[in-house]
From Swiss-Prot:
CDD domains: RHH_NikR_HicB-like. One of its GO terms (biological process) is response to nickel cation. Keywords: DNA-binding, Metal-binding, Nickel, Transcription, Transcription regulation. It comes from Pseudomonas putida (strain W619). Its cofactor is Ni(2+). InterPro entries: Acetolactate_synth/TF_NikR_C, ACT-like_dom_sf, Arc_rbn_hlx_hlx, CopG, CopG/NikR_regulator, Ni_resp_reg_NikR, Nickel_NikR_proteobac, Ribbon_hlx_hlx. Belongs to the transcriptional regulatory CopG/NikR family. It comes from the Bacteria. This is Putative nickel-responsive regulator. The lineage of its organism: Bacteria, Pseudomonadati, Pseudomonadota, Gammaproteobacteria, Pseudomonadales.
Length: 138
């Protein structure tokens, strides 16, 4: 095994520490490895060229410089995948967006990653399903 260093904000570290305690892990490393494995399984669920539908949701701080514009540009650059988007103002500083996407799994994964790695996006999640008539996710 190799040792790496990562930087986490205190809130995220608290979440990991609570998971360590509630799930009975010996330490943070195994909990983080399990989370990484789950993320990798999720991203490998469908072949890149498989037709699918997806829901991508993300919560962000709309005061982050240029973030709303960047998110909007990213969605417009992939307008052929976007079926619908819901925008919710949660409080004075945070918004939630939920987009329904349809297209090839690889392109949807790429779009989802582009949205969620933006600075100021605090939480994000993608749920991918085979399009009607397609094989089930393995």
């Amino acid at each position: 095994m190799q040792r790496i260093t990562i930087t986490l904000d205190e809130e995220l570290l608290d979440v990991i520490d609570r998971r360590v305690a509630s799930q009975g892990y010996q330490g943070r490393s195994e909990a983080i490895r399990d989370l990484l494995r789950a993320g990798m399984r999720e991203s490998e669920a469908l072949p890149d060229d498989a037709a699918c539908v997806a829901v991508v949701s993300y919560l962000y701080d709309h005061s982050t410089r240029e973030l709303p514009r960047r998110l909007n540009q990213t969605l417009h650059a992939h307008h052929d995948l976007t079926r619908s988007t819901l925008h919710v103002h949660l409080d004075a500083g945070h918004c939630l967006e939920v987009s329904v996407l349809q297209g090839e799994s690889g392109r949807i994964g790429e779009l989802s990653r582009q949205l969620m790695v933006e600075r100021g996006v605090e939480h994000g999640q993608v749920q991918v399903m085979p399009a009607p008539g397609q094989a089930k996710v393995r």
